[in-house]
Amino acid sequence: MGNEKARVGIIGASGYGGIQLVRLLLEHPQVELTYLAGHSSAGKPYSDLYPHLTHRVNLTIEPIDLEAIASRCDAVFLGLPNGLACDMAPALLAKGCKVLDLSADYRFRNLNTYTEWYKKDRQDQATNNQAVYGLPELYRDAIRDAQLIGCPGCYPTASLLALSPLLKQGFIVPETAIIDAKSGTSGGGREAKVNMLLAEAEGSLGAYGVAKHRHTPEIEQIASDLAGTELRVQFTPHLIPMVRGILATVYATLRDPGLVRDDLITIYSAFYRASPFVKILPHGVYPQTKWAWGTNLCYIGIEVDPRTGRVIVLSAIDNLVKGQAGQAVQCLNLMMGWEESLGLPQLAFYP
């Protein structure tokens, strides 16, 4: 595209993921934000939804008009509830737009798995076959050549970055993998929910979606690819009383009980040597969610328990940035041939 900025639109910009996209794209040196679209909020100035942006964003949320969007955008982010993107992506792709879907619609190669977990029948297998899973640390080259990206969920991002070196190189017994993950309340979105009320969430910690969370098959699909065999993982998410961040703690049995922590730190550092957003911590240092706030970083700490023969990997991300909007922009950078880290923050809000 030469020195011209890419024209980018967002369909579904009213939620927390949407405003993260708006923030990142407004500050991106190669992007012009040209279209914000939505259903219930159509006709409203974007600053009506987020008044602190009154002096920065002068766009009005427009109706979802695929013809207009395609004529005004080179790339489109779909920040819609599950089950809607698959009705829009084929038309946008046919009109030449690059599409990055933040919902679950294009994360699964097997649409029967999607239907089983998300309860929507699909008739777009041909379009689905074009989709690339948007985890750059694993699929960087495929993302560069893609027109359609299925952006990963927040829990799968944190979990898979923790697990990938172990599975890819066969260091663990795959079926022993257990993922214990904790997320802030922004992961539940902006709509009012009783369990997200301050009076309900403050001072409380609880699990949800036990043995049935929708991110489970997403994790299993990629983990199976890495391991070279179909596998199941035990995944349990928890809600904690903070706004943003995910900490995933992964446990697995080592094939070689002689592996020590320093060996694994070296292995992880080599695995992610070309990944600018993954930071492997030195021995004895374990990540905290606040370190990643507002950034596209993933911090990983590693430990081995010689008594049990298990490895323990801790992964911390910002669920709204590396777990959602930031990772989507990272994919856009690759699709457009730009520097992968362009326009993405690497310094946290601290404290």
From Swiss-Prot:
Gene Ontology molecular function: any one: NAD binding
UniProt KW keywords: Amino-acid biosynthesis, Arginine biosynthesis, Cytoplasm, NADP, Oxidoreductase
Pathway(s) of this molecule: Amino-acid biosynthesis; L-arginine biosynthesis; N(2)-acetyl-L-ornithine from L-glutamate: step 3/4
EC number: 1.2.1.38
One CC-aspect GO term: cytoplasm
BP-aspect Gene Ontology terms: L-arginine biosynthetic process
Catalytic activity: N-acetyl-L-glutamate 5-semialdehyde + phosphate + NADP(+) = N-acetyl-L-glutamyl 5-phosphate + NADPH + H(+)
Segments forming a coiled coil: none
Subcellular location per the Swiss-Prot or TrEMBL entry: Cytoplasm
Enzyme class (EC, first level): oxidoreductase
Catalytic center residues: C154
Annotated CDD domains: AGPR_1_C, AGPR_1_N
Family assignment from sequence similarity: Belongs to the NAGSA dehydrogenase family. Type 1 subfamily.
Biological role: Catalyzes the NADPH-dependent reduction of N-acetyl-5-glutamyl phosphate to yield N-acetyl-L-glutamate 5-semialdehyde.
Protein name per its UniProtKB record: N-acetyl-gamma-glutamyl-phosphate reductase
Species of provenance: Synechocystis sp. (strain ATCC 27184 / PCC 6803 / Kazusa)
Lineage, uppermost ranks: Bacteria, Bacillati, Cyanobacteriota, Cyanophyceae, Synechococcales
Gene expressing this chain: argC
